[in-house]
């Protein structure tokens, strides 16, 4: 038998009606109290209680339950008091049966209440942390909130602020005529074409027009009306494997007509940027950058090729590269010999406007801070990419090896005046840089094996600043 749960009213006349008809446990068939109607008299197992159960037991069940418990403790069955209206045996028997049914129902409700699920409401209390004897700190639990990222968050990032050449970023939005009017550095004419058969990129430097006159650093205007320009060509980001045109003397409209070839795969060439740097070689053997032209090769048809006139824009590079030198070092502990091979150099600065350069290399052994030995290679005529393949040997005991330095200086031969300085590096105890120190360390760990390495030449002032051995040589 099923029972429905209703809310009683605790005041006035309606309280009496609810006590009879709207009590918490009312028979669904006759709407009487469950312990008074005859249709509800059944065994404990046949009673079906529908929940959820109230938090408190009805007052009329509490009173009856207490009476039943007292009677049960005395092992006697208590009977409800007889009503003055009817004291017949049938009425007393009915009341006794009702009392037993009530006690069964009360016991069932009590057992179910003990298993009643807890309330879904969660009472959040502060969490206390702290060591024994220390001041307690109350930490309130916080509500996790989803982070919000504005839509224009990444738009605020400005890559030009992190660019090495951020001053020229606005040039991309200008036309060639606007660039020419703004900077007045002239125009450069060149062409490109890719050879699919041989995997070569051919670059032809044709001419330049309206180059600016050179700037006088000493205030004199003698021989400063015209420039002595030349062009350096490379494929970014690789600036080491560069090419260089000859110097055109005293002209603002030089005609070069020189072709250069870069061995590179087609897909790799499309990822490169062709950089042409226009440089002025003045009478004081100074190399001043006039400007540059940069063209991404993925923006043009390399196979078809083409000719372009491009406006020259300013360059952040104030000094040009001095060139590179390929060396090989080897030490034989048993013989106490330090062997040096001068293999080749490339892209050396020109020291003569008409003939290019006549470069040679001077090798000087410095023991501590004292010059011990000097040797030099032969002079290569009219080239900026000389091949030497010359070997030199120095007597250095093993216990003194850590106290020696090798100074390599590249000069351009000059028959009229003193030789022209091109570049220098120092290897050994007083190295001029980390690449030089790395080469020396690799040689010491090579176990008699020759170690080759390319080195970028440095200026005399830079070497003198970081290497005491550079100050001891001429």
Curated annotation (Swiss-Prot):
SMART domains per the UniProt record, alphabetical:
C2 (SM00239)
InterPro entries assigned: C2_dom, C2_domain_sf, Synaptotagmin, Synaptotagmin-15/17_C2A, Syt17_C2B
One GO cellular component, as annotated? membrane
Record localization: Membrane
Q: Which keywords does this Swiss-Prot/TrEMBL entry list?
A: Differentiation, Membrane, Repeat
Which Gene3D superfamilies does the UniProt entry name for this protein?
C2 domain (2.60.40.150)
Q: Compositional bias (Low complexity) spans?
A: 96-112
Where's the C2 domain?
184-310, 321-455
Pfam families under this entry? C2
* Region annotation (Disordered) ranges: 54-112
Q: Which GO terms describe its biological process?
A: cell differentiation
* Family to which the UniProt record says this protein belongs: Belongs to the synaptotagmin family.
Please name the PANTHER family in this protein's record. SYNAPTOTAGMIN, SYNAPTOTAGMIN-17
Summarizing the function annotation, the protein's role is: May play a role in dendrite formation by melanocytes.
Protein name, please? Synaptotagmin-17
Q: Which organism is it from?
A: Xenopus tropicalis
């Amino acid at each position: 038998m099923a029972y429905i749960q209703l809310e009683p009213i605790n005041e006035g006349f309606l309280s009496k009606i609810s006590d009879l008809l709207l009590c918490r446990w009312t028979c669904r068939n006759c709407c009487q109290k469950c312990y008074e109607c005859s249709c509800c008299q059944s065994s404990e197992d046949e009673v079906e209680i529908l929940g959820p159960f109230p938090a408190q037991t009805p007052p009329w069940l509490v009173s009856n339950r207490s009476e039943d418990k007292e009677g049960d403790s005395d092992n006697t069955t208590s009977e409800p008091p007889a009503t003055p209206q009817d004291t017949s045996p049938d009425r007393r028997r009915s009341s006794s049966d009702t009392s037993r049914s009530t006690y069964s129902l009360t016991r069932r409700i009590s057992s179910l209440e003990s298993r009643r699920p807890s309330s879904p409401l969660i009472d959040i209390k502060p969490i206390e942390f702290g060591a024994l004897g220390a001041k307690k700190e109350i930490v309130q639990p916080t509500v996790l909130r989803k982070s919000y990222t504005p839509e224009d968050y990444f738009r605020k990032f400005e890559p030009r602020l992190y660019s090495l050449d951020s001053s020229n970023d606005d040039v991309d939005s200008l036309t060639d005529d606007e660039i020419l009017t703004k900077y007045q550095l002239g125009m450069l004419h060149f062409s490109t074409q890719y050879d699919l058969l041989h995997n070569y990129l051919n670059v032809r430097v044709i001419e330049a027009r309206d180059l600016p006159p050179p700037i006088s650093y000493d205030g004199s205007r003698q021989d400063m009306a015209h420039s002595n320009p030349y062009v350096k060509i490379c494929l970014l980001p690789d600036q080491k494997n560069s090419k260089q045109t000859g110097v055109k003397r005293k002209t603002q409209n030089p005609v070069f007509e020189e072709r250069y070839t870069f061995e590179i795969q087609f897909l790799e060439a499309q990822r490169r940027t062709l950089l042409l740097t226009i440089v002025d070689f003045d009478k004081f053997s100074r190399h001043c950058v006039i400007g540059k032209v940069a063209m991404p090769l993925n923006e043009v048809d390399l196979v078809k090729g083409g000719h372009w006139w491009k406006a020259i824009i300013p360059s952040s590079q104030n000094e040009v590269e001095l060139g590179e030198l390929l060396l090989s070092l080897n030490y034989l502990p048993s013989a106490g010999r330090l062997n040096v091979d001068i293999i080749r150099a490339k892209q050396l600065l020109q020291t003569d406007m008409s003939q290019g350069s006549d470069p040679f290399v001077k090798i000087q052994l410095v023991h501590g801070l004292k010059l011990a030995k000097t040797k030099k290679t032969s002079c290569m005529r009219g080239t900026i990419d000389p091949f030497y393949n010359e070997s030199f040997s120095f007597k250095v005991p093993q216990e003194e090896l850590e106290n020696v330095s090798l100074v390599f200086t590249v000069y351009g031969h000059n028959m009229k005046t003193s030789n022209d300085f091109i570049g220098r590096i120092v290897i050994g105890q007083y190295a001029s840089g980390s690449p030089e120190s790395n080469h020396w360390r690799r040689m010491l760990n090579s176990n008699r094996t020759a170690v080759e390495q390319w080195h970028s030449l440095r200026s005399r002032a830079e070497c003198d600043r970081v290497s005491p051995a550079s100050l001891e040589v001429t």
